[in-house]
Every structure is written in C-alpha cells, then in structure tokens.
C-alpha cells in the first residue's frame, strides 16, 4: 500500500512539475517514459526466470497451487500485458519469482488511464473528484471480497487503486499549498507509531476493508511531513541510504525473489538450521542490493536514457 501511494505521488508530482497542468500532458511522451522505465527490467526478469526455470529449478517453474496447471507462455503473456494479478486471483501464485508482477500490473493499468483522464477531464476539480470516487470505492470493493482465499481483496486492480489515488491527491495538495508545518516531526512520529500499531493489530486479511485505506491515508500524510524542496540535499547517513535505496527500489522489488529463489535452491528451508538463517538473511539483503545496484547502473538506467533520447525529441 505504501509503495502504491508513493508511486501515485511521484507520477503526479512529476507531471505537474513538467507540464504545469494536467490538460497539457503529452500522451505520447508519458507512455514512452513509462515504457522506458518499466520494460527493460521486466524483460530482463522474464528472461532470467525463463533461463533458470529451464534448469528445472522449482522457484522459477510454474506450479499448480490450486490444482490447476497454467502454461508458462500464458504466465509470460499475463506479465507483459499487466494482468498477472488476475492470474494469481484465478489460479494462485503460479510462479514464485514472477508473482511480484501482480503489483506492477495494478500500477501500469492505472497509469495507462492516468494521462487519458488528464486530457478528458480538463478541469482539476473533475480530476480530483474522480480520484475521490476511486478512494471511496476501494473499501467497498474490498468488502465484496472480504476473506476470500483468492486474495482478490488484495490483488485486484480496484483493491489497490485507492492507494495510488491517495498518492495522486497528496501530490496535488503539496503542489498547490506546499505545507510547511512546524509540528511535522512529532506528527510524523505519531503517524509512524499509528501505522505500526495498525500493522501489528491483525493480519491484513482480517482488516483489508478499512485497514488498507487507513494505511494509504497515513502514508499520504507521512509524505507531506517528509517533503522537502527539490534542491534540498541529503546530509545524514540515514537519509543518504534511504535516497540510495529509493532510487533502486524498482530493481530491488523485481529481482529480490530471484535472489531468494536461488537461496531456497541452495538452502532448503525445512532442512536449514535456524542458527544460520540470520546469516542467510543478511547475505540475502546484501546480495539483493548489490544485484539491484548493478542492474540499475549498467542496464536499466542506460536503457531508460537511450529510449527517451531516441523517442522523445524535446527536453521535456
């Protein structure tokens, strides 16, 4: 939920910063930027999982958790056309390493609609009203699927759209009002403690109807508390680390299960002594960050820049 809110905030913030108003958005350029950021890593993930699966490594092969076989080509098709979440709802988590793409499916469908909505509404008030409607519809939709074993209350598009919409509205608010609250620090700690309490209160399955909405709204407030002018430089070590991780969050998210899958092959969980699991966890985190950084530096960022340079001729 937090990542959906942050994603919605960033895409709206950058749109307003670049185009000044939603009606001025360049549809072609928007889609090119999205493709340049998303597709290189997505294709690399699919190729990597396909190669590893060809060696009969279970975490990278399709399974049948609900007793229904799903072909690997169909899984790839779902990944490339952004309905992996629907595949998981219908057939379960059919591929361990590719399952993470459910959230990417949600985001990309939303962002396919986002620029169209910008052009069709023309009015900021109508634009905001649509997002408010999405936010209100979210808990109702989750209530319709409350407790379902399919996980539709979590994986479906309309189960998560409200989080992205909260992020979009947060960006609109901050762009217009640029709040400079003197009580940001105590408020941020209060929000963090409240979110922690909500997280520990009950499993998400039991509080999905309202819990996801509250978490999204709290995340939006937290973004406002931590927002700084774009020219502000990170000074503390913690801030620098968080910025570094944030810049590579997409690569980390997409490939963390590849690393974990390989470790599960080498160290079968049921047969691994608990005394070394902490060391494995540390090794897993370090290896994931190293691989993500390498992919970002030598693959995704260069390709992102190249695609934009070729297909976007102006400086926007």
Task: Map each language-model feature to its residues.
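Alpha-helical transmembrane segments in multi-pass integral membrane proteins
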Residues: 2, 10-29, 51-55, 86-93, ...
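Membrane-interfacial loop-to-helix junctions in multi-pass inner-membrane proteins
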Residues: 20-43, 60-73, 106-113, 121-129, ...
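Transmembrane helix irregularities
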Residues: 6, 39, 51, 105, ...
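Small-polar-interrupted transmembrane alpha-helices in polytopic inner-membrane proteins
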Residues: 7, 125-144, 188-197, 288
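Membrane-interface helix-loop-helix regions
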Residues: 46-104, 137-152, 162, 215-220, ...
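Hydrophobic alpha-helical transmembrane segments of multipass membrane transporters and ion channels
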Residues: 36, 40-44, 48, 251-255
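Hydrophobic alpha-helical segments with transmembrane-like composition
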Residues: 38, 86-133, 157-161, 171, ...
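Hydrophobic transmembrane-helix microenvironments that flank and shape a buried ionizable site
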Residues: 4, 10, 31-37, 82, ...
């Amino acid at each position: 939920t937090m990542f959906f809110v942050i994603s919605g905030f960033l895409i709206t913030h950058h749109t307003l910063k670049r185009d000044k108003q939603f009606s001025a958005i360049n549809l072609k350029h928007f889609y090119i930027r999205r493709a340049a950021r998303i597709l290189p890593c997505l294709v690399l993930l699919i190729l990597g999982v396909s190669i590893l699966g060809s060696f009969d490594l279970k975490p990278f092969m399709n399974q049948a958790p609900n007793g229904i076989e799903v072909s690997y080509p169909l899984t790839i098709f779902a990944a490339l056309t952004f309905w992996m979440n629907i595949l998981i709802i219908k057939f379960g988590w059919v591929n361990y390493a590719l399952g993470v793409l459910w959230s990417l499916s949600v985001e990309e469908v939303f962002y396919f609609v986002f620029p169209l909505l910008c052009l069709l509404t023309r009015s900021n008030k109508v634009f905001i009203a649509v997002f408010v409607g999405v936010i209100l519809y979210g808990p109702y939709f989750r209530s319709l699927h409350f407790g379902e074993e399919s996980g539709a209350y979590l994986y479906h598009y309309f189960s998560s759209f409200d989080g992205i919409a909260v992020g979009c509205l947060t960006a609109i608010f901050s762009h217009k009002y640029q709040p400079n609250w003197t009580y940001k620090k105590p408020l941020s700690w209060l929000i963090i403690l409240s979110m922690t309490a909500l997280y520990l209160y009950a499993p998400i399955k039991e509080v999905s109807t309202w819990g996801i909405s509250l978490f999204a709204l709290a995340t939006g407030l937290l973004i406002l508390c931590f927002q700084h002018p774009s020219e502000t430089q990170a000074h503390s070590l913690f801030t620098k680390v968080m910025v570094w991780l944030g810049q590579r969050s997409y690569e980390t998210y997409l490939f963390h299960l590849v690393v974990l899958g390989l470790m599960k092959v080498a160290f079968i969980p049921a047969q691994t002594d608990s005394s070394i699991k902490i060391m494995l966890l540390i090794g897993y985190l370090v290896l994931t960050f190293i691989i993500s950084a390498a992919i970002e530096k030598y693959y995704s960022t260069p390709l992102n820049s190249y695609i934009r340079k070729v297909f976007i001729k102006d400086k926007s």
